[in-house]
């Protein structure tokens, strides 16, 4: 699922839960979508961190 649609659906289910409540199926869907979102974010952070290189600093005497 596209990230924008994923976030829109998560937000829709959140608002619906506050206004009228969710069915059992919608609660399961909400949990699944939230987990998918978290996994995507964690994957993105991991990729970014793997691309980071440590730059050695020269030894300084103060």
Curated annotation (Swiss-Prot):
Protein family membership: Belongs to the UPF0291 family.
Subcellular location: Cytoplasm
Any single GO CC term annotated in Swiss-Prot or TrEMBL for this entry: cytoplasm
Source species of the chain: Clostridium botulinum (strain Okra / Type B1)
Domain of life of the source: Bacteria
Name this protein carries in UniProt: UPF0291 protein CLD_1956
Predominant subcellular localization, coarse grouping: cytoplasm
Keywords linked to the UniProt accession: Cytoplasm
């Amino acid at each position: 699922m596209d990230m924008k649609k994923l976030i829109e659906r998560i937000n829709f289910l959140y608002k619906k839960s506050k206004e009228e409540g969710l069915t059992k199926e919608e609660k399961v869907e909400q949990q699944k979508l939230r987990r998918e979102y978290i996994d995507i974010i964690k994957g993105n952070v991991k990729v970014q961190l793997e691309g980071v290189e440590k730059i050695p600093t020269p030894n300084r005497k103060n």
